[in-house]
């Protein structure tokens, strides 16, 4: 976060860092641009530690940079926290990402007389930038351009110098950075949430573009020093959307946001002629009909949305689909060409593993469609088209509403392809779309009856292993339920297809083991019967079984049954997921973990 303007810089910097806490961190620090010197304060631990260390009689300072760090090179200590400074203490740098060639830079700089005080890769940048600033006669922008040419890796950098403290210079490469335009003040941050209280005017920054802000101006240059046009856009949500709104945690608020988020993602995407309308795809009818295969690429929770996409696309559009883990994708030899459509799913639009996979797919000639929740982020910019979900800001690290809107988005893509390829009739497409329109109310119905579920959950607080079973399209839901419990409550949890029980996982069942089974819908009768058999298998071995089942479905052998509204099989993941989110949330609260910022996790994973 960087600020320069008329007000005391401490306030927007600390408030901005607080809004970025959801991204995860283990230390925090600031550098304030006092004349002829810099005030540096940094502390390991939470932002409150930094605030508590600031002197009460601080003079008013009008510019500065602030940072929250996840340890990569060097442990989470005061010494390794950012900002890092040159040996004169007049230039400070903060950094997200990884500098891959920092060791060779450090050796070169030490040989020329620089002294290092930390274990980080970032400190090499501070010393290098200081040397290059002297070579460029005090021009920090020119020095930053020269510095970037020496660096390998993925990074965002901000720098400030005591000789010109109201000027802040930044650059990004494969890591997020955005500028904010205020009234006589300007901002730089890794996320617009940091400055949303002050302005809704933002400026998009591209790869290797060097941005310089002063109180009255924002300028952007390429690495050759050529000026670039500002690409301004308006932030479409307000500060209230990033507040808890009376809920105990952001995650709980975001669970209750889901009916509106789903509705907002659906609105306006059906034409007056009852056709799915996705002009955002930027594909002709012939191009959609020529698709031979689809690869869905994602990480974490978004990967589970991709698994749901496979069922929907193959069922409705009759196109073969592979679902790929982004971090693995480019390290094998994926079959992808000009007849392939690659769907890249990301909440943040900045996931580094996914960005690298997108670039790999594009280099092979594939068309890339991003499904994303964050406007003007990197993955949508580098894709051929983007379908934005409209979940609003998701602050809790564990994804909830973004996940459900990703599923709804891939339903829309599936129906559009089916419509164009005529694998479904117009009437079938219309009926499915109208059934989707019922999903917000059905999710609301689940949330209105949440209290018995919360009470039930407390009976499982002491279980240290929970197994989730699903069949067919409910298998991704089982995986998501297990992931949520791992993320939030730090409990060993696994998701399995019900049919795989006898191939190994049933050995884990002992007296008192918690098993959550998701019963398929009545229109999947064969799977429904199989899952009921699985329930009997684990119950016979002492498991405590909770079943998520559609209203009216017969359930035998369960200790507890959680009812959800009836819907078609392919839409059931949206409804079956909600009780699992609540289950994980309540277990985490009861066990006293940090629900919104679980240990070791970051909201946006911007390094490989």
Where does each model-flagged region fall?
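Conserved short alpha-helical segments that host acidic/polar catalytic motifs at enzyme active sites
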Residues: 1-249, 260-292, 331, 444-447, ...
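C-terminal interaction segments
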Residues: 92-96, 255, 599
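A SIS-like phosphosugar-recognition module
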Residues: 163-164, 173-177, 183-184, 202-246, ...
């Amino acid at each position: 976060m960087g600020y320069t303007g008329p007000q005391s810089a401490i306030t927007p910097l600390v408030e901005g860092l607080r809004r970025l806490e959801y991204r995860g961190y283990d230390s925090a620090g600031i550098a304030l641009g006092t004349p002829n010197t810099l005030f540096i304060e940094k502390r390991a631990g939470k932002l409150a530690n930094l605030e508590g260390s600031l002197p009460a009689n601080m003079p008013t300072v009008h510019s500065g940079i602030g940072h929250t760090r996840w340890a990569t090179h060097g442990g989470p200590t005061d010494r390794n926290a950012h900002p890092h400074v040159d040996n004169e203490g007049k230039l400070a740098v903060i950094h997200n990402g990884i500098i891959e060639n920092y060791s060779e830079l450090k050796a070169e700089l030490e040989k020329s007389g620089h002294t290092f005080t930390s274990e980080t890769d970032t400190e090499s940048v501070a010393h290098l930038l200081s040397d290059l600033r002297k070579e460029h006669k005090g021009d920090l922008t020119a020095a930053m351009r020269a510095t970037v040419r020496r660096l390998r890796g993925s990074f965002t950098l901000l720098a400030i110098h005591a000789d010109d403290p109201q000027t802040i210079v930044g650059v990004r490469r494969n890591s997020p950075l955005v500028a904010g335009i205020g009234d006589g003040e300007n901002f730089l941050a890794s996320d617009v949430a940091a400055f949303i209280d002050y302005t809704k005017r933002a400026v998009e920054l591209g790869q290797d573009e060097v941005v310089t802000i002063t109180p009255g101006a924002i300028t952007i240059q390429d690495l050759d020093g050529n000026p670039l046009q500002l690409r301004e856009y308006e932030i479409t949500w307000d500060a209230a959307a990033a507040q808890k709104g009376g809920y105990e945690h952001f995650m709980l608020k975001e669970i209750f946001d889901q009916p509106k988020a789903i509705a907002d993602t659906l609105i306006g995407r059906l034409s007056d002629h009852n056709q799915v309308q996705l002009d955002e795809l930027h594909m002709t009818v012939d191009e959609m009909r020529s698709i031979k295969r689809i690869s869905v690429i994602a990480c974490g929770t978004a990967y589970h949305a991709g698994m749901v996409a496979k069922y929907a696309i193959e069922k409705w559009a009759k196109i073969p689909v592979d679902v790929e883990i982004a971090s693995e994708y480019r390290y094998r030899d994926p079959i992808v060409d000009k007849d392939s459509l690659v769907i890249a799913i990301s909440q943040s639009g900045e996931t580094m593993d996914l960005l690298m996979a997108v670039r790999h797919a594009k280099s092979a000639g594939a068309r890339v469609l991003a499904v994303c929740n964050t406007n003007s982020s990197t993955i949508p910019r580098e894709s051929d088209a983007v379908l934005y979900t409209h979940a609003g800001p998701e602050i809790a690290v564990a994804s909830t509403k973004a996940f459900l809107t990703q599923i709804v988005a891939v339903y829309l893509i599936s129906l559009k392809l089916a419509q164009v390829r005529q694998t479904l009739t117009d009437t079938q497409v219309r009926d499915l779309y109208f059934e989707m329109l019922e999903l917000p109310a059905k999710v609301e119905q689940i949330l209105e009856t949440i209290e018995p579920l919360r009470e039930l959950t407390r009976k499982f607080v002491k279980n240290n292993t929970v197994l989730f079973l699903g069949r067919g399209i409910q298998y991704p839901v089982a995986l998501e339920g297990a992931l949520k419990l791992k993320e939030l409550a730090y409990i060993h949890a696994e998701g399995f297809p019900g049919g795989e029980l006898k191939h190994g996982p049933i050995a884990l069942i002992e007296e008192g083991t918690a098993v959550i089974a998701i019963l398929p819908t009545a229109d999947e009768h064969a799977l429904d019967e199989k899952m009921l058999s699985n329930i009997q298998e684990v119950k016979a071995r002492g498991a405590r079984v909770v079943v998520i089942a559609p209203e009216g479905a017969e359930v035998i052998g369960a200790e507890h049954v959680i009812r959800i509204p009836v819907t078609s099989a392919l839409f059931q993941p949206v409804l079956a997921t909600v009780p699992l989110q609540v289950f994980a949330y309540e277990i985490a609260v009861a066990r006293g973990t940090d629900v919104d910022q679980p240990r070791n996790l970051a909201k946006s994973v911007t390094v490989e």
